[in-house]
């Protein structure tokens, strides 16, 4: 029985990087007889231009029917002045919410070949392997009420709401505990419980759940301290679990510990491990169309897709190994290039990974 993957290239460099990931996916599909069927559609700004909406109803229906979704990136300055409800990012938020993709897994893994590319000293980041588990469908980005108005004294003001219910907290903490159990058995729950009521509930629930995971060491950390500790001593962390906005910020910070956000994949999963997979980086409109974008994060997102949503562990391992082989050979895109390495473009990097497979 075949499995269906919906491909959404998105905007900016999305089409370029996704093309290389699809190249890898098609190669392993044939070589490993995976019986995968690929289809394509638009999301974000591309969907706004095609359908008049950043997420068309028919695209959402196709995503529901698919076994997994592979996304490039969304957004661009040409859509910054349109109705906020129609901006590309709203399509991304909507598809996550409608598909119930509440758990975002963002690894921050430093390839030893790229230790010099990190902005931190090699001895601080050597061997770095962190997983950030971010709650994706609740909190400040979705909370109601939200909006803007004129206050009683005539000023413009805007407001947002940060709600979390116990069931939302429990299900993301469960993912955090389970992932920690599979890794180094250390879980750091990040909150702002000294200020926020939602974080106080979060910390209480985490403490209650820890009793069910006696093999996992749970620690708590305020988000401001966590941001500092990620730079001071990042290797103290194994798995970090946190709410939506904190995870958004910390995962981007952690990505730069690895040398380039262009190396980092991500997975967004529902309760049944059906998911959407995308690189951690954005649409990079400043380099779109130049053929210089790093496709490795998207290729590694394919590996995560095969591992978590398809159960093809050996194929996922093979892709990750192939990326390591390519880095060993000295090939680098511009974002990870250093003296003595060979600078290549997007297509050449994708071809090299296929050759290594």
From Swiss-Prot:
Signal peptide: none annotated. Its EC number is 1.1.1.85. One of its GO terms (biological process) is L-leucine biosynthetic process. It is found in: Cytoplasm. Keywords: Amino-acid biosynthesis, Branched-chain amino acid biosynthesis, Cytoplasm, Leucine biosynthesis, Magnesium, Manganese, Metal-binding, NAD, Oxidoreductase. Catalyzes the oxidation of 3-carboxy-2-hydroxy-4-methylpentanoate (3-isopropylmalate) to 3-carboxy-4-methyl-2-oxopentanoate. The product decarboxylates to 4-methyl-2 oxopentanoate. This is 3-isopropylmalate dehydrogenase. It comes from Xylella fastidiosa (strain 9a5c).
């Amino acid at each position: 029985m075949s499995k269906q993957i919906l491909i959404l290239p998105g905007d900016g460099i999305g089409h370029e990087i996704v093309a290389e990931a699809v190249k890898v996916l098609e190669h392993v599909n044939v070589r490993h007889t995976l019986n995968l069927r690929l289809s394509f559609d638009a999301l974000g700004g591309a969907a706004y231009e095609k359908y008049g909406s950043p997420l068309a109803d028919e695209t959402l229906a196709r995503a529901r029917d698919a076994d997994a979704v592979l996304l490039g990136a969304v957004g661009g300055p040409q859509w910054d002045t349109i109705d906020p409800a129609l901006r590309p990012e709203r399509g991304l938020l909507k598809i996550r919410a409608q598909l119930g993709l509440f758990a975002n897994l963002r690894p921050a893994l430093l390839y030893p070949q790229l230790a010099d590319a990190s902005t931190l000293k090699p001895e601080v980041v050597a061997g770095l392997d962190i997983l950030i588990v971010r709650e994706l469908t609740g909190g400040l980005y979705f909370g109601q009420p939200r909006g803007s108005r004129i206050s009683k004294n005539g000023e413009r003001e805007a407001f947002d709401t940060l709600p979390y219910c116990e069931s939302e907290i429990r299900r993301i903490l469960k993912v955090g505990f389970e992932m920690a159990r599979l890794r180094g058995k250390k879980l750091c729950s990040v909150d702002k419980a000294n200020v926020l009521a939602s974080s106080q509930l979060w910390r209480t629930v985490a403490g209650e759940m820890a009793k069910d995971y006696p093999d996992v060491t749970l620690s708590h950390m305020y988000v401001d301290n966590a941001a500092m500790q990620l730079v001071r001593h990042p290797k103290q962390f194994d798995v970090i679990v946190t709410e939506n906005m904190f995870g958004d910020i910390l995962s981007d910070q952690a990505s730069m510990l690895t040398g380039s956000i262009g190396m980092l994949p991500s997975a967004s999963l529902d309760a049944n491990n059906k998911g959407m997979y995308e690189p951690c980086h954005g649409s990079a409109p400043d380099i779109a169309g130049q053929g210089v974008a790093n496709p490795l994060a998207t290729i590694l997102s394919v590996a995560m897709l095969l591992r978590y949503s398809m159960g093809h562990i050996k194929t996922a391992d093979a892709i990750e190994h192939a990326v390591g082989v390519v880095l060993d050979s000295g090939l680098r895109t511009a974002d990870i290039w250093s003296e003595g390495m060979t600078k290549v473009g997007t297509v050449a990097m994708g071809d090299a990974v296929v050759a290594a497979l």
